[in-house]
Amino acid sequence: MPGITREEVAHLARLARLELKGEELDHFAGQLDDIIGAVARVSEVADQDVPPTSHPLPLTNVMRADEVRPSLTPAQALSGAPAQEQQRFKVPQILGED
Amino acid sequence: MTVIDLESYEDALATYDPVMGLEVHVELGTKTKMFCGCSTELKQDANSQTCPVCLGLPGALPVVNEIGVESAIKIGLALNCEIAEWCRFARKNYFYPDMPKNFQTSQYDEPIAFDGYLDVQLEDGEIFRVQIERAHMEEDTGKSTHVGGATGRIHGASHSLLDYNRAGIPLIEIVTKPIEGAGARAPEVAKAYVAELRELIKALGVSEARMEMGQMRCDVNLSLRPHGREAFGTRSETKNVNSLRSVERAARFEIQHRGVALDLETGGTIVQETRHFHEEDGSTTAGRIKDNAEDYRYFPEPDLVPVAPARDWVEELRKGLPELPRLRRARLKEEWGVSEHDMQSILNAGAVDLIVATTEVGAPADQARKWWMGELARNANETGRALDELGVTPAPVPAALRFRPGAPPFRLSASAAGFPGPWSRRRSSRRCGSAAAARSPPSTTASGVCPVPACRPRASCRRP
């Protein structure tokens, strides 16, 4: 199985907006390799006749009528926010985007 | 803003074929959000329409809105698409705070509708077939306000404020296949397509599709391919182009801009990027470098079960589809006996449905048309409003026209309909409570709304 490369870790880190040092890239490459190796063992038991699944129950079409339900109050909605301003969630400057 | 050199439109087209892709997002007119029961009504009160589901709180479970699915199927059918027998939602992961879940629930490789087309009519009457790649269900994002920057843009902002009232409102994203062969008419095709799609969405009754209110938004993807080459160039994506005129301008601008960029590049490739459209001058500027699809790390949404629309439901919805707008327009043009040019004016004025409604309450078509396309259309145009925002409804028009079967045709004017004569030239007063109005109060409509277009209703307009 191909190992996770340093470059792939650096790419993932960029997507997650994490700044990693050189030695951390190597460290996490090894760790991610181990994790992927562990998950890959599933393929050993799941043969061609087992379709990939995203849900444990064989359900389809669970739908909701288009009826309004009460929302939280703004105070309730914001109660878990680390910071707020003008009844809005306050977040740090968004870097690297425009 | 930096000044960008533009190649002349003709020069760019002499070397390249434009290849376009259009992505249109339609906000559905459902009462509730796509995955929770929060209201979709537009409210100024920030974060007043959120719940654990649309805030992405741990343990909250989304359930899909049935009308959202039904609307998606209707749109798919009207676009001549196949409707998936089985499809799933997917998480689109990205690092941006406009979704509190840190992902957008969307569809990826299993859209509910795919492989369709929409025939659009160009100004000279030619029909251009736009192939549809897919229409899929997803949800809208929250609204960010950037604080501390000079212009309210992200650049230079110290922090951002998030209102999640809009987060989770149902969206249908409609994606075309690459539109090729339009050549110099590419911008016109883009505009005609978005216009036709808007009419279709309105006819289906799934959204009001008001572009100026963000209920319908268009991304214009464009690449240029040197004549005779097979491969597409690297595309640019101009986001959130929000009027028909802007769709045309953005496409035109990008053809000229891409032309310059390609000429400068020896290898003929330019970076895939997101561009922002500027309403003021019709230009676009570079935004972020786009992540590739794989960078969104799409995976099937484990909190939602698959959607498998029963075939009899799909067929029932197919039977209920309205007459296609293009065919309806052709029929009405025939019935009303108007020229292509006049029909275009009626369309541009947004008067089709009003005229139809007016004939349905008893007015002859030609008088109904003159009623709406005369002073009312001019007034709407001058005051920058839609015809149906003037407070005039079709119901009382026949009476106002003093229409009697067999009566000799009469000359239509606003004063003939009992309106104070000079109203259309008294825009500065902004209401009809003038001396003329006091002497001869305008007839109020059934709803009690003053029918005078320029009127900001005051008590004096509503005398019994």
From Swiss-Prot, chain A:
<comment type="subunit">
    <text>Heterotrimer of A, B and C subunits.</text>
</comment>
<dbReference type="GO" id="GO:0050567">
    <property type="term" value="F:glutaminyl-tRNA synthase (glutamine-hydrolyzing) activity"/>
</dbReference>
<dbReference type="InterPro" id="IPR003837">
    <property type="entry name" value="GatC"/>
</dbReference>
<keyword id="KW-0067">ATP-binding</keyword>
<dbReference type="InterPro" id="IPR036113">
    <property type="entry name" value="Asp/Glu-ADT_sf_sub_c"/>
</dbReference>
<dbReference type="GO" id="GO:0006412">
    <property type="term" value="P:translation"/>
</dbReference>
<dbReference type="GO" id="GO:0070681">
    <property type="term" value="P:glutaminyl-tRNAGln biosynthesis via transamidation"/>
</dbReference>
<dbReference type="Pfam" id="PF02686">
    <property type="entry name" value="GatC"/>
</dbReference>
<keyword id="KW-0547">Nucleotide-binding</keyword>
<dbReference type="GO" id="GO:0050566">
    <property type="term" value="F:asparaginyl-tRNA synthase (glutamine-hydrolyzing) activity"/>
</dbReference>
<dbReference type="GO" id="GO:0006450">
    <property type="term" value="P:regulation of translational fidelity"/>
</dbReference>
<comment type="function">
    <text>Allows the formation of correctly charged Asn-tRNA(Asn) or Gln-tRNA(Gln) through the transamidation of misacylated Asp-tRNA(Asn) or Glu-tRNA(Gln) in organisms which lack either or both of asparaginyl-tRNA or glutaminyl-tRNA synthetases. The reaction takes place in the presence of glutamine and ATP through an activated phospho-Asp-tRNA(Asn) or phospho-Glu-tRNA(Gln).</text>
</comment>
<protein>
    <recommendedName>
        <fullName>Aspartyl/glutamyl-tRNA(Asn/Gln) amidotransferase subunit C</fullName>
        <ecNumber>6.3.5.-</ecNumber>
    </recommendedName>
</protein>
<keyword id="KW-0436">Ligase</keyword>
<keyword id="KW-0648">Protein biosynthesis</keyword>
<dbReference type="GO" id="GO:0005524">
    <property type="term" value="F:ATP binding"/>
</dbReference>
<comment type="similarity">
    <text>Belongs to the GatC family.</text>
</comment>
<feature type="region of interest" description="Disordered">
    <location>
        <begin position="75"/>
        <end position="98"/>
    </location>
</feature>
